Amino acid sequence: MRSSPMYRLLAGYYDLVYDAKDYRKDTAQLVRVARKYGRSRGNRWLDVACGTGRHLELLRPRYRVVGVDLSDEMLRLARRRLPGVRLVRGDMRSFDLGERFDVVSCLFSAIGYLRTEADLRRAMGVFARHLRPGGVLLVQPWIDPKYLKRGHVTLTLHDGGSVKVARASSVTVRGARTSVHFHYLIAEEGRGVRHLRETEVLRMTPPRRLVEIARAAGLTARMLRTGPTDERGLLVAVAPRER
């Protein structure tokens, strides 16, 4: 599993492109779910595929946070935002931090970048091993196949003052594979206008199958129909109290 070229090329513009995302609302909802379903008593939170650290920044006042991401570029930005926080480069299929957490999260459909079910099972096992007894796993999956709009197109504009970004996208589907084709126009003072293209490939896994994989990893699992993004839902899986 490689870090996406998009994150290497566009890490510096990532927060601008997602400026409309309500991280505060997302985080508040995640905390409510973690408190409702979690059975451990601590306050340690691991965010896998933490990106630039926006969720961790909001969790930090209440939790002792750690982040893992595959992208050096995204981690560099996260370190600027979160001085003193442990941020580790790692692959979600294989990392081992040597410690356990009360909450493990994998958000913003990062799990969808795993191309095979075997990879998904490996990642779920890694998540489970990092949970304390009674700890809770929160996974925001890629979109449920039944909600996917084939041929869907979008256009968004983002004004960062001296930097302006237009992003257009289209979606193609082949079996369980979703390809999201992005075109970026980046207008930046002193650098002119650049056009970048990138295709992101994500695997669709039916919610019922995600629950089965989490249970096979030894967790008690369910899929909530509403999550940080409603049509994606939220996998909630709890480790047994004694292991």
Label the model's feature ranges.
Residues 24-41:
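Conserved alpha-helix/loop element of class I SAM-dependent methyltransferases that forms part
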Residues 41-49:
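Conserved class I S-adenosyl-L-methionine
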Residues 46, 53-94:
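Class I SAM-dependent methyltransferase SAM/SAH-binding core
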Residues 93-103:
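A short acidic, Gly/Pro-enriched loop at the edge of an enzyme's catalytic core
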Residues 102-118:
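A short SAM/SAH-binding and catalytic strip from SAM-dependent methyltransferases
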Residues 121-133:
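A short glycine-rich, Lys/Arg-flanked "PGG" loop and its adjoining helix->strand segment in the class I
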Residues 138-209:
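SAM-dependent methyltransferase
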Residues 203-243:
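C-terminal lobe and adjacent flexible extensions of AdoMet/dcAdoMet transferase-like proteins
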